[in-house]
Amino acid sequence: MDYLKTVVPSQLMAERGANLVVINPGSSNVRIGFASQDVPFNIPHCIARHITQRKDDTPRLSVRDKMLNCHATPSQNAERERAYDIIASLLKIPFLDEEMPSANQALPPKMGRVDALSSQQNKDDSKFTWTDVMDRSIKSSTPIVDKDADVDPLQRSTPDDTEPNSEENMYKEIIFGEDALKIPPSESYCLSHPIRRGHFNISQDYSLHQVLEDLRTIWNWILTEKLHINPRDRHLYSAILVLGETFDNREIKEMLSIVLCDLGFSTAVIHQEALAAAFGNGLSTSCVVNIGAQVTQVVCVEDGVALPHTALALPYGGDDISRCLLWVQRRHRTWPNFQTDPVNRPIDMLMLNKLKESYSQIRSGSFDAVSVVHSYEHEKSVGHQKTKLSALNVPPMGLLYPRVLVPEEYPPPPRSWFQDYDDMLEDTWQTSDSLYSSGNGGFGMWDNYPMFPTRLKKFDNIGLVEAIVSSILSTGRIELQRKLFCSIQLVGGTASTAGLAPVLEQRVLNTIPSNQPIEKAEVLQSRSYPLFVPWKGGVILGVLDIGRDAWIHREDWAKNGVHIGSGRKYRDSYFLQAQAMCYYNS
């Protein structure tokens, strides 16, 4: 302990972080890096596999995200219009039937405008290159362990079973990361996202086995190609999994098995994302608001312990704001005549996310920006047009008024998913059939998961302000409530939205019931980029964990799996039961 008091933090990170790999998986991106790094690799959490088309089929890119509801229903459109009117009134945005200035007229005094594109930026934004799907590397008759480790032997073409110059062998079998999002639509690839809305993307068309295989392949590729860790040397490394509170016990167990058994790490530990976020900003008590790409989580942390009864999950995030941006532009008739389809064309979603990150902010009055919008309908000639984007302050307000977002819905997993016989805390065999949906009910993927109804409360239609107030007030102690209201912490990519923090402060304070003796609400400024705060917190927790009482060894996990022990650490953790049941005799 004397050494910890005198050592420089950077030196401690370098000494103990060289053999620690921190993995923070999300629905849209996965953040992986050595604990000794300042920032992790942030890579799209997806994989594209080459598929063989029948002769009578037209080759095309397919997206394996089966959704019950991709487009807004008439009732949802009506609610969305009402929500837009409320937001427009609050932000003092002129309605469409009011007279708007033409493109040649000067903007009125209350209308803001951002001409953020310089000539050089305009030139760079107009350039786009599709992913080259042809494998131009030289095929060797001797397989290389490092390169072949991330490919399933059953799906990999080898010189022994195919001709080297065959047409099938010319295509890349697997494409990862952002390259997978830029595959030309005419190519025969299937794009898969293993995680959606904070859960495994299991459906009748995407089996659990394939989800796990895709996770293993993606993570293995990052470890090999980005971190340059040879599969034969991974027994020298330990892994830290920083997982969100939305993940189910079985999902945690499966990811732990991937890290230890498939990827070959010697030991691993799991940390809650909310707890890691608090430590990442140097806090021990905080209300952590994690605004992810597809899920927003609110969890209160007291003295380094996440309080389970305060956890809330909201089924919307940054991706929904990006789609709302497109809807707002079409509503204002400012979007070019492009067939933009963010659901079925991943490159369109990538473009909308970049527009959102560049221009969306919360501010009063009309807010416009001039930007280049791309059309990816024709592969040989990617079209682009410079256009004025209107009401850019409306989409991020969807965090406060979620009815304007209209998130897509995913079907529930098959019934067999709920039968986890290893979980000693769940009597799934006693669950009646009425608790499961047939898949046609139109509800979110996991909303009817019945095993722990109070484990993580989920709300579809409440805004972020109401969620924060409800979470903090559920602690029940006025002293703690005052601390939490003064230490609200925003993490996640969307947390960087300009103007979000002051709006939350004001609205949270106004939403607190008048009978509560609380006079102040404050959103703390993040010490680093909010997207990487949970990952950085995982680094800190891993480096400072000297005793490693909660670390799980590969041999013990492979032999015993989930079992009860006598250790005390994480015994009271309500979320990480997959790890909490794996104690070690002290």
From Swiss-Prot:
InterPro entries in alphabetical order: Actin (IPR004000), ATPase_NBD (IPR043129)
SMART domains in the cross-refs: ACTIN
Q: Where is this region: Disordered?
A: 141-169
Q: Which domain of life is it from?
A: Eukaryota
Q: Which family does it belong to?
A: Belongs to the actin family. ARP8 subfamily.
What is the official name of this protein in its record? Actin-related protein 9
Organism of this sequence: Oryza sativa subsp. indica
Q: What is the lineage of its organism?
A: Eukaryota, Viridiplantae, Streptophyta, Embryophyta, Tracheophyta
